[in-house]
Amino acid sequence: VAAWCAGRRRAPGRSTTRVGGLLALLLLTLSVSTSAHQLQAALTTIELNPRSELVEIVHRFYAHDAEHALAEVAGIEGDIRTDPALLEAFGRYVARHFSLTDAEGNALEPELVGAEVEGDFLWVYQQLPAGDFGRIARIGHDSLQEVWPQQENRVNLRRDDGVRTLILRNRDNRVAVPD
């Protein structure tokens, strides 16, 4: 950037706002790329798979956040990308912190299928029998919120008539699924 700026002549009276803007953009890009894992957000998708006749629940977290949470909450440290025990521990952690209930308050209990790391993301998979899909009335998801109170867990419930998005913050207990 400095070489580019040195080679340009500035017209008399012209400001250096353009150069300042470029430098600000460069610094912003660097700061975003170095702290991307600190977004403290997770995404969960719940949808019915008619072929398998299962409700598929897929949670996406930043792998670095998962490692940090395991170290802080459970005292378990290591590389989640190479240690299957850490991956399994985080899957169990998410399963404990995610809940579904029906309109009467009865728990629907998703089965933990597994977890995997792909790139920067850690994926946790759960499933329910298809018959439970229409019964989902409330969703709870407070994963990582005891580590980061500002953690936002977004849940997309995909149905035939569209997607319902719930955003759980501040250790929301259970949020009602909108009609």
Kindly label every feature range from the protein language model.
Residues 1-15:
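N-terminal secretory signal peptides that target proteins for export/translocation
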Residues 20-31:
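Bacterial N-terminal signal peptides
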Residues 36-179:
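N-terminal soluble domains immediately following signal/targeting peptides that reside
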Residues 17, 31-35, 155:
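Serine/proline-rich low-complexity intrinsically disordered segments, especially terminal tails, linkers
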